[in-house]
Amino acid sequence: MSELLRARSQSSERGNDQESSQPVGSVIVQEPTEEKRQEEEPPTDNQGIAPSGEIENQAVPAFQGPDMEAFQQELALLKIEDEPGDGPDVREGIMPTFDLTKVLEAGDAQP
């Protein structure tokens, strides 16, 4: 089917109003045999799931060494940043206040 569509789209790209002079063969779609269907189906047993419904960690490697220490430090920083309040990049001081009447008057003035 895709060959038929490809041949027609190529002939229209060339600007020819005539059908392509190349013969287009029929496309045969083959259904997979019963053996192949069985091979393609995923296993139906629930591997890694305990009867209680919890997922078992069978092949999860444990963190060890300097990577674990770096991971813990990064995790601690993330926890600090996620807490409500000011972050480390907030400067202490008084924020400037704007008098809206002065701002509006300045906007009305024409140069």
Curated annotation (Swiss-Prot):
Pfam families to which the protein is assigned, alphabetical: GAGE
Polar residues: bias regions: 8-24
Region: Disordered, residue numbers: 1-66
Family the entry assigns: Belongs to the GAGE family.
Protein name in UniProt: P antigen family member 2
